[in-house]
Structure formats: structure tokens, C-alpha cells
Amino acid sequence: ALPLWTFAQEKLDEFNPVQYAIISQTISPDARGASLGDAGAATDPDVNSQHWNPAKYPFTISRADVALNYTPWLRQLVNDIDQAYLAGYYRIGEHSAVSGSLRYFSLGEVQTSDADNAMTVNPYEMAIDASYSLMLSEKFSIAATLRWIYSDLRYDYTSEDNSPASAFAADLSAYYQTYPTIGSRECQLAFGLNISNIGSKITFSGSDAAEFLPTNLRLGTSLMVPIDEYNKFSIALDANKFLVPTPPTMEQYTKETGLSDSQGYDQWVHEHYNNTSSISGIFKSFSDSPEGFKGEMKEIQWSVGAEYTYNDKFSLRAGYHHQDPSQGNMKYFTVGAGFKMSVFSLDAGYVIATAKTNPLDQTLRLSLSFDMDGIKDLLHRR
């Protein structure tokens, strides 16, 4: 699966994005996080924290919650690619929680044919997560996640060598919140970290080389300021960097070997890039950009978001996401709203790209969540 690198608006010799497989793992699954410019490492805990930072779950108010999220994807290009995301958690006592999610990313119907007949295939990606989070103090928690990833991108079912691909991965995350006093108001300040998709490389049929998973480092902070008894305002900032090595360029090959032939370059790439293990790639990713430190900084994606909440029932959100042109140029504003009514919540998010050529423009996300604790109490009253 190819990320949206095709749409970068930069000179070809300056365009050298980090490359990885399983694009669905990089798609924000829920409306709230997406409305905040794709920020979520340290935002107030909610049911969809499984994607952003599962270490937040021990700090949730409700004991159990389930959410269903839906995203029609790339509607500016096609009309049948979408992602469904089911997430839920259960708090065990006052200091720990278990959580999980199921992600299904459909690439729609694709017309193909074998030697005799035309056929329709439905390529897709999916992932199943399970997490355990633990509060180590009244302010700090950690979490570990295990993930099974499955990708069936086959367009030719007649070849014996054509088979789905799968991989295992793990996440490590941490969350810290404190309550400083600003003026006369007790605020909530939080910090979050999530290293996701640490795992094996994945090999697709017909490929000579295994591909990297989208291993990602997410760091974030947020500040919530209560305006009065009913109103509060929060801001969040996330920084994301893929822990995947940068593809070596022909310029690097020429500089190191004094040669410029394509065959030698391909062999050099195979030795210096394709043969890199996923763990080695994590460490290389901090210092392997052809542009040095400047290039490493360009690989960081920034997300900033703001949220206004009234009486914990109604929310308005806005955000901005920035990606350097050399990495894909995905720049867009986001807006959204949320309503909480008794035992369920409904959220919506919308993307407004800075350039109409951005295929993410007008992307809509919908989320529906159920407070299982509230449902249980409601049934007991009856």
C-alpha cells in the first residue's frame, strides 16, 4: 500500500519520503482526534485512546466504553475506499484497564481477470489490537499493546505465489497528567508518548524485499483550562516521526562510491536499506537523512488542536496538521463537533485541505460511542 506521496508539490530531487507498508495504520480512525488536527497523545482520555495512547485508559471516568468509527477515505479520488474501527476498554479496579480494537480498511472493488474470466476482487487490510494499561501513580500510567496485522492486496488469485501478508507488532506508551493552578483556576496539564508498530517487517507476494511497518513515535502535550463551572477550553500539540529509515538517494550512492550507474545503485540500496532490520531501522531513522539534522526535522509531522466543551455534553473542535513537502505535503485544517446524550456520544470531523489537489480534502469521519457503565445503571433503574 502506498502512502499519498504522489501528491507532494516539491521538486523531484527534493522529494524523498519515508516509505512503509500498511497505510491503514497511519489513518486517524475517530472523529475527535481527527478534528484536532490528528492530535491525541495527551488529550483527555476517551474510548478511542487505543489508537492515540492506550496508557490514558486508567484515567477515564466511565468504567467501560465501546465505540464504532467510520471514515470514507479519498472520496476526492474514488467512492468505495473506507475504514471501520471498533474500539473498547474496561477498567479493572481503579488502577488498570484492558482495551482492544479492530480496524478494517477496504480498498473497494477492483476489476481484474484470469486467463478465462473477468472477476471482481476486494483487497483490504485489517488489524486486531489488545492492550493492558496500568497506573503507576495518581499522575502516571503506562501501557503495552500487541497487534496482529493482515493485508490481502491480491489482484491476481490465479498465481500460487500470490498470498496475503501478515505481521505482528507492539506498542509502548506512557501518559502523565498534573493539575497546576493558573491564576485562580486549577487546570489539567498532560504529556503523552506512544511508540507504535514495533515489529517484524512484512513481505508481499511478488516482492523481493520485506517492507517496513509504519513504526511511529508520537509525543504530545495538552492543557485544559476551565472557564467556569460549565465551560472549559483545551489545546493539544503532537509531534510524529516515523521510526523508519530514509530511502538512500542516488546522490548518496555517488558520494560514497564515486559511481552513478543504476544497477550498482540498486545493489547498494539492497545492501544499505532493504537488508536493514526493523529494529536497526528504528535507530537509523534518527540520523540517516541525506540532509542531516535539517532533513530529520522535516520528517516530523505536527498536529495542533483546540477543543471547547460545554457541560461535558457539547464540544466544538478545530485543528491543523502539517507535513513537510519533502515527505508528502499533507497540510490541512480540521473541524468537528461532538454531542453526548445520556449513555451515547456522537462525534463528527471534517478535513479542509490547504490545496484542492490534496486527496484528503473534505474527508468526513463519524464516531458513535456507548457508555457501558451508563447503560448498566439505566437498566438497573428499570
Positions of PLM-derived features:
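Sec/Tat signal peptide C-region and signal peptidase I cleavage site
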Residues: L4-A8
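Subset of outer-membrane beta-barrel
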Residues: Q9-R382
